[in-house]
UniProtKB/Swiss-Prot annotation:
<keyword id="KW-0863">Zinc-finger</keyword>
<dbReference type="Pfam" id="PF02132">
    <property type="entry name" value="RecR_ZnF"/>
</dbReference>
<dbReference type="GO" id="GO:0006302">
    <property type="term" value="P:double-strand break repair"/>
</dbReference>
<dbReference type="Pfam" id="PF13662">
    <property type="entry name" value="Toprim_4"/>
</dbReference>
<comment type="similarity">
    <text>Belongs to the RecR family.</text>
</comment>
<dbReference type="InterPro" id="IPR023627">
    <property type="entry name" value="Rcmb_RecR"/>
</dbReference>
<dbReference type="InterPro" id="IPR034137">
    <property type="entry name" value="TOPRIM_RecR"/>
</dbReference>
<keyword id="KW-0227">DNA damage</keyword>
<keyword id="KW-0479">Metal-binding</keyword>
<dbReference type="Pfam" id="PF21175">
    <property type="entry name" value="RecR_C"/>
</dbReference>
<keyword id="KW-0862">Zinc</keyword>
<dbReference type="GO" id="GO:0008270">
    <property type="term" value="F:zinc ion binding"/>
</dbReference>
<dbReference type="GO" id="GO:0003677">
    <property type="term" value="F:DNA binding"/>
</dbReference>
<comment type="function">
    <text>May play a role in DNA repair. It seems to be involved in an RecBC-independent recombinational process of DNA repair. It may act with RecF and RecO.</text>
</comment>
<dbReference type="InterPro" id="IPR006171">
    <property type="entry name" value="TOPRIM_dom"/>
</dbReference>
<keyword id="KW-0234">DNA repair</keyword>
<feature type="zinc finger region" description="C4-type">
    <location>
        <begin position="58"/>
        <end position="73"/>
    </location>
</feature>
């Protein structure tokens, strides 16, 4: 748009690249940031650069971390015989909020979606298989309750069953078509409690 200076338009474009942010919201965020004191803008930009520079994926589970392995994988009080498989790192935050699960996680970084051109080789399934050893008794599949999540869950069940590990799926207290990120703690706790074997 010609009525904004190039620097403002560029900032709007960058905000609009974020998921769920359209042009109008990006415009509001840009104008908000421009009205902040310079020191706050500097702190924000430094925090962004520092997070991007120091945060990496845990070599064990695939969660975001600044230390490898992450705090969950390195915690001796976590039950390492149970692995909860989730689609994205943000889903760990949702599961941890319920304070009902004491196992470890495996982040797939996606799901199987033929419509989007994502197959089993595009998510972290080989890494999951490598983690299945004699010490793992159960794999809880907590993928989102949508078509892609169900396809992913069934595929995981198919590849893990021959390894002799119990594979369960969280119960559908979580609304079909919804994301774990938006489920409340009680719903997630009930879904975890009512998981079923696949």
């Amino acid at each position: 748009m010609d009525f904004y200076p190039i620097a403002i338009e560029k900032l709007i474009e960058e905000f609009a690249k974020l998921p769920g942010i359209g042009y109008k919201t990006a415009q509001r965020l840009t104008l908000y940031v421009l009205n902040l004191p310079k020191e706050e803008v500097k702190e924000f930009s430094e925090a962004l650069v520092k997070a991007r520079g120091t945060i990496k994926y845990c070599s064990v589970c695939g969660n975001f971390t600044d230390k490898d392995p992450c705090a969950i994988c390195s915690n001796p009080n976590r039950n390492k015989s149970i692995i909860c498989v989730i689609e994205q790192p943000k889903d760990i935050m949702s599961m941890e909020k319920i304070r009902e699960y004491n196992g470890v996680y495996h982040v797939l970084h996606g799901n199987i979606s033929p419509m989007a051109g994502r197959g089993p080789e595009d998510i972290k399934l080989k890494e999951l298989i490598r983690r299945i050893d004699g010490s793992v008794n159960e794999v809880i599949v907590a993928t989102n309750p949508n078509v892609e999540g169900e396809a992913t869950a069934m595929y995981i069940s198919k590849i893990l069953k021959p390894l002799g590990v119990k594979v369960t799926r969280i119960a559908h207290g979580v609304p079909v078509g919804g994301d774990l990120e938006y489920a409340d703690e009680v719903t997630l706790a009930k879904a975890l409690e009512g998981r079923i074997e696949l």
